[in-house]
């Protein structure tokens, strides 16, 4: 007899599934007779199941919030939070419509959040609905059009701007000044320190505030992007717009393609970033972010100064201006500049054209979008208070006019992007074109004669060389044994040593030996801050009271000159808030010294591995330090003019300023990479044991992934408070990586955390954030370089709790004791013991 399908049984199962779904979620509508409770685990879902609204508790804490997140994206990404500053303290909260308002009630039936619509504005009955573009609205139940909206979440953003959402001032909708405010931390939705605000005076622009202080300025809207965001390049699926009229001054964007999801968010560390979901990679991709480097800091170079990240010092005076204060030893242009010659205001003044610039702060400006550049110049010359002018729109050759009537500050120069800025200067500071032409002609003739003489001399020298025996000097043998960059640096240092009084090569302020001797109390041991592989670092004070750190190169070091020239060459061109700042150098009396900014809190290792000082490093400070180091490394790998591999990242090479801001230092081992290069090989393996990647320590192969490995080791050291090198666990583990990996596999990750953090945080211990950091650290120290993430991915993982993080594979140099050493009664080794090349009895440590 044939088997007959049991259709009744199938229908019953289908009925149960439908019934379960009905009790699990709501539709997009939410009526006055319904309620949403935490205990029921019910949610409201938009019609196309793109967004979802419900209660959530980050990090499995006791704090409950009402929020909106992407349902269609597998990673939980929150885009709006209702009661961010007044969470529910238990899981007995309820959302319901009460008195024609959306209200959240706690377990005692007390309201903790409400839409606060007054009675006169409400038309009964009302309903709530979650729309497909992420807007949660309270509306007239008989009118589902925008005209029927009584309240909407889009008017009260948190840290995220969605498609069709507005940021800025909107008097049209009732006087809303919509701002973004960051989460306090990645696991705490409460209002953080950072916010975006719009200034409508002059030429409107957005500012990022850290509490009450401005940290970054977007620059004015130039028709297709903001002046200070050159990375805000047009993409085919995003339409950006900026509306400015009597009713509103707002920025918004629209994602014009289906199945593409993109957000603008303000992170808990103050980064404004554009993220787009990549379906293939199942992760958020960071398209751009701001602020990006030291030049993005607000008013970094003072009045009439401009910042250029590719020069040293980064602050420069506009032509026709000079530094406000000439310091006796080291010049500091951040104080600003002043005019060399006073304006005449009689029509003889002219303009200096600055290309590829970020426009100055536009608070004191006047705008006329109806005239062109020529009329703008004429208008500027007629008013003596006019200091500069530019186009308001850079599209189609430029149009409109903006005129500055006060000081010019917060200007920077870009390698790419930016626009022309015309700065008014006195006639005497404008070089006559005819004189300039004569100089060029004279210089050309002189150069031609010099080249001819050089050719003749070279010809006779070459003939003489053919008759002589080639002699290889010891220094040439040494040079040939080095890699290509070191060849270049040794040659440069040799040629430079014979010309110690010339400054063209370094483009840095040079100081005399006696000035540094005086500043450091004749290099007194009382002024000694520390000692590295190539010399001693002293604390010093200049005559103007400025504190400095002086790195005095050891005369006994055979490699010191190479590293000195390398460090000068690299750091002079690197400017970032998380990189140590080089102020000058000294090549005098047979000595070579570097002068850095003095950082009050010394190196990270002096705090991290000190039993007393480590108590000052709570988890939030450690997390901020981790983020800062990551940003500095990302700048070296991706955002600087030349790609740089540090090769010696470790705790002692991270310095801390008075605010505990981390700054990567010691570039003596660093290598410059071409943009197309991915890895290089060297026969001279340098670095520090405990931080070297396997491929570098064993084969001399290094790349960005080598630095990522070092960063991973450092991250795990910061979390655990233990050194990787010299770590000794008498039971099973011979290094920190093995210790962390074993606890990770056993599900006991939190046991590796420095106990000081656990004691300090007690009930508010951010478990989820720390677990993410441990996982990121393990990803960075994976044995195979291709498995490790790049630093841009690390930054995204650190900055967003919603980003998917892969499961890590075995770390490099992860070695544990064999079972014979652990327990003499056992003759077998555990299968999950992590080894390298099956060696279990040898001590193998990351170099």
Swiss-Prot record:
Q: Where is this region: CaM-binding?
A: 612-629
Q: How does this protein assemble?
A: Interacts with PUB9, PUB13, PUB14 and PUB38.
> Which stretches of this protein does UniProt put in the Extracellular compartment?
32-439
Function (record text): Involved in the regulation of cellular expansion and differentiation.
Q: Where in the cell is it found?
A: Cell membrane
Q: Topology in the membrane?
A: Single-pass type I membrane protein
UniProt keywords, alphabetically: ATP-binding, Cell membrane, Disulfide bond, EGF-like domain, Glycoprotein, Kinase, Lectin, Membrane, Nucleotide-binding, Phosphoprotein, Serine/threonine-protein kinase, Signal, Transferase, Transmembrane, Transmembrane helix
Record domain PAN: where: 345-426
Tissues where this protein is expressed: Expressed in cotyledons, leaves and sepals.
Q: What is the originating organism of this protein?
A: Arabidopsis thaliana (Mouse-ear cress)
- Single GO biological process annotation from the record: protein autophosphorylation
Here the disulfide bonds are 295-307, 301-315, 376-401, 380-386
What lineage is on file?
Eukaryota, Viridiplantae, Streptophyta, Embryophyta, Tracheophyta
Family of this protein: Belongs to the protein kinase superfamily. Ser/Thr protein kinase family.
Q: Name one GO cellular component term.
A: plasma membrane
Q: Please state what the protein is called.
A: Receptor-like serine/threonine-protein kinase SD1-6
Please list the residues that make up the active site.
Answer: 648
The glycosylation sites annotated in the UniProt record are 29, 41, 92, 116, 171, 256, 385
Location of the Protein kinase domain: 523-813
Phosphothreonine: residues carrying this PTM: 682
- Which terms does the record give in the GO molecular function aspect? ATP binding; carbohydrate binding; protein kinase activity; protein serine kinase activity; transmembrane receptor protein serine/threonine kinase activity; ubiquitin protein ligase binding
What enzyme category does the UniProt record give? transferase
Which reactions does this protein catalyse? L-seryl-[protein] + ATP = O-phospho-L-seryl-[protein] + ADP + H(+); L-threonyl-[protein] + ATP = O-phospho-L-threonyl-[protein] + ADP + H(+)
- Modified residues annotated as Phosphoserine in this record: 557, 652, 665, 824
């Amino acid at each position: 007899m044939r088997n007959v399908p049991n259709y009744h049984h199938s229908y019953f199962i289908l009925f149960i599934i439908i019934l379960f779904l009905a009790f699990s979620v709501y539709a997009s509508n939410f009526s006055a007779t319904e309620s949403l409770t935490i205990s029921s685990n019910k949610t409201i879902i938009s019609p196309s199941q793109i967004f979802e609204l419900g209660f959530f508790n980050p990090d499995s804490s006791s704090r409950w919030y009402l929020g909106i997140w992407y349902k269609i994206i597998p990673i939980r990404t929150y885009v709006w939070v209702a009661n961010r500053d007044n969470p529910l303290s238990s899981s007995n909260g309820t959302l319901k419509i009460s008195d024609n308002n959306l209200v959240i009630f706690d377990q005692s039936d007390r309201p903790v959040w409400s839409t606060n619509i007054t009675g006169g504005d409400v038309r009964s009955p009302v309903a709530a609905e979650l729309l497909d573009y992420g807007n949660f609205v309270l509306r007239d139940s008989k009118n589902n059009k925008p005209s029927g909206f009584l309240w909407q979440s889009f008017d009260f953003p948190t840290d995220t701007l969605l498609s069709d959402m507005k940021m800025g001032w909107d008097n049209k909708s009732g006087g809303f000044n919509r701002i973004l405010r960051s989460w306090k931390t990645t696991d705490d939705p409460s209002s953080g320190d950072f916010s975006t605000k719009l200034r409508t005076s002059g030429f409107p622009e957005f500012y990022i505030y850290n509490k009450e202080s401005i940290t970054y300025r977007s620059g004015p809207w130039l028709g297709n992007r903001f002046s200070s965001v050159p990375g805000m390049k047009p993409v085919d699926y995003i339409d950006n717009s900026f509306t400015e009229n009597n009713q509103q001054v707002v920025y918004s964007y629209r994602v014009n393609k289906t199945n593409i999801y993109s957000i603008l968010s303000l992170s808990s560390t103050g980064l404004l970033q554009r993220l787009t979901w990549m379906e293939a990679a199942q992760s958020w991709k960071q398209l751009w972010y701001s602020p990006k480097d030291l030049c993005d800091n607000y008013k970094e170079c003072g009045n009439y100064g401009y910042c250029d990240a590719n020069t040293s010092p980064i602050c420069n005076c506009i032509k026709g201006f000079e530094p406000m204060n000439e310091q006796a030893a080291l010049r500091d242009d951040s104080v600003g500049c002043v005019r060399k010659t006073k304006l005449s205001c009689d029509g003889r003044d002219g303009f200096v054209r600055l290309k590829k610039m970020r426009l100055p702060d536009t608070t004191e400006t006047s705008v006329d979008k109806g005239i062109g550049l020529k009329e703008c110049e004429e208008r500027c010359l007629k008013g003596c208070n006019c200091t500069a002018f530019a186009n308001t729109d850079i599209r189609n050759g430029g149009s409109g006019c903006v005129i500055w009537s006060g000081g010019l500050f917060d200007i920077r120069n870009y390698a790419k992007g930016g626009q022309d800025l015309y700065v008014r200067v006195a006639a005497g500071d404008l070089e006559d074109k005819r004189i300039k032409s004569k100089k060029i002609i004279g210089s050309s003739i002189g150069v031609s004669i010099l080249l001819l003489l050089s050719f003749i001399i070279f010809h006779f020298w070459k003939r003489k060389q053919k008759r002589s025996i080639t002699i290889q000097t010891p220094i040439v043998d040494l040079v040939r044994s080095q890699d290509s960059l070191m060849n270049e640096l040794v040659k440069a240092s040799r040629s430079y040593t014979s010309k110690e009084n010339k400054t063209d090569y370094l483009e840095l302020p040079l100081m005399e030996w006696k000035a540094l001797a005086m500043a450091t109390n004749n290099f007194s041991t009382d002024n000694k801050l520390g000692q590295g592989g190539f010399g001693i670092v002293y604390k010093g004070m200049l005559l103007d009271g400025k504190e400095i750190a002086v790195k005095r190169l050891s005369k006994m070091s055979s490699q010191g000159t190479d590293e000195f020239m390398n460090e000068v060459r690299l750091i002079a061109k690197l400017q970032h808030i998380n990189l140590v700042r080089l102020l000058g150098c000294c090549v005098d009396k047979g000595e070579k010294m570097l002068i850095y900014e003095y950082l009050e809190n010394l190196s990270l290792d002096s705090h991290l591995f000190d039993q007393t000082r480590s108590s000052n490093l709570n988890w939030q400070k450690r997390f901020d330090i981790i983020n800062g180091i990551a940003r500095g490394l990302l700048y070296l790998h991706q955002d600087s003019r030349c790609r740089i591999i540090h090769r010696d990242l470790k705790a002692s090479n991270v310095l801390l300023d008075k605010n505990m801001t981390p700054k990567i230092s010691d570039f003596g081992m660093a290598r410059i990479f071409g943009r197309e290069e991915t890895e290089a090989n060297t026969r001279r393996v340098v670095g520090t044991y405990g931080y070297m990647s396997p491929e570098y320590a064993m084969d001399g192969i290094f790349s960005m992934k080598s630095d990522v490995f070092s960063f991973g080791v450092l991250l795990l050291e910061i979390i655990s408070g233990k050194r990787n090198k010299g770590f000794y666990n008498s039971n099973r583990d011979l290094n920190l990586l093995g210790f962390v990996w074993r606890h990770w596999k056993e599900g006991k990750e939190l046991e590796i955390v420095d106990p000081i953090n656990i004691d300090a945080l007690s009930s508010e211990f951010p478990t989820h954030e720390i677990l993410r950091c441990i996982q990121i650290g393990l990803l960075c120290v994976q044995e195979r370089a291709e498995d490790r993430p790049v630093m841009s991915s690390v930054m995204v993982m650190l900055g967003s709790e919603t980003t998917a993080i892969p499961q890590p594979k075995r770390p490099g140099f992860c070695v544990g004791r064999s079972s014979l050493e652990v327990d003499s009664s056992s003759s077998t080794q555990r299968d999950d013991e992590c080894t390298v090349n099956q060696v279990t009895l040898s001590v193998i440590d990351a170099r």
